[in-house]
Amino acid sequence: MKMMNGEDANDQMIKESFFITHGNPILTVEDTHPLRPFFETWREKIFSKKPKAILIISGHWETVKPTVNAVHINDTIHDFDDYPAAMYQFKYPAPGEPELARKVEEILKKSGFETAETDQKRGLDHGAWVPLMLMYPEADIPVCQLSVQPHLDGTYHYNLGRALAPLKNDGVLIIGSGSATHPLDETPHYFDGVAPWAAAFDSWLRKALINGRFEEVNIYESKAPNWKLAHPFPEHFYPLHVVLGAAGEKWKAELIHSSWDHGTLCHGSYKFTSA
């Protein structure tokens, strides 16, 4: 089947969706950060296809209603404090895609998310632009960002993702950007390897995803060990639930990166490929 632009629909279609841990924004200036080579070799080792657009769900945009930004050029939001001055000079001027934003809003409303709306001003927070700046440094792919609703649960976000899954048929790459674990800042660092509580949670999550047990991940509060330490607040976990829904039916999960910061912050990242 040919698209109106002459492109074959099967060539445009994307079967993959991704959950990435975006890490500490210091990685923008810290060459030795373990996430840098992962992001910098993204197109070479992880996903070589150039998407028509990117829809990224960041744990740093929390709203009451599901909201997608609808701008022509994305501003770069420096939503962090007390970092080196050079970090506040970074710009990632990726184009927006208002048409995609309106389509996301329409799809969500038709799927039961009646309060979905667009935001005509918001740019990209560091959960979006920091990894994208390294993954797609040319900033030539249109990007829309979708918010999370931390007062709701994992199943809600999974269903949100299910509604958005057809966007992949149009060449939209769906990325959830959060963290495999995201403990409180005051959680003690663990300098002798990985904290046992964090290792147990990571092991549970990895096995659940690799074995396709998404239902357990949706109700992680009753299934996961040490979840209150791993995710005392859920905003960095919910991008994963959205991506699980967007993965569609009969998906296969693959761990594409794993490293740690301070023995407690897990950089686990996953690819989900639909059948």
Swiss-Prot record:
It catalyses: L-dopa + O2 = 4-(L-alanin-3-yl)-2-hydroxy-cis,cis-muconate 6-semialdehyde + H(+). Keywords: Dioxygenase, Metal-binding, Oxidoreductase, Zinc. InterPro entries: Extradiol_dOase_DODA, Xdiol_dOase_suB. Its cofactor is Zn(2+). The keyword Zinc applies. Belongs to the DODA-type extradiol aromatic ring-opening dioxygenase family. Opens the cyclic ring of dihydroxy-phenylalanine (DOPA) between carbons 4 and 5, thus producing an unstable seco-DOPA that rearranges nonenzymatically to betalamic acid. This is 4,5-DOPA dioxygenase extradiol 1. It comes from Beta vulgaris. The gene is DODA1.
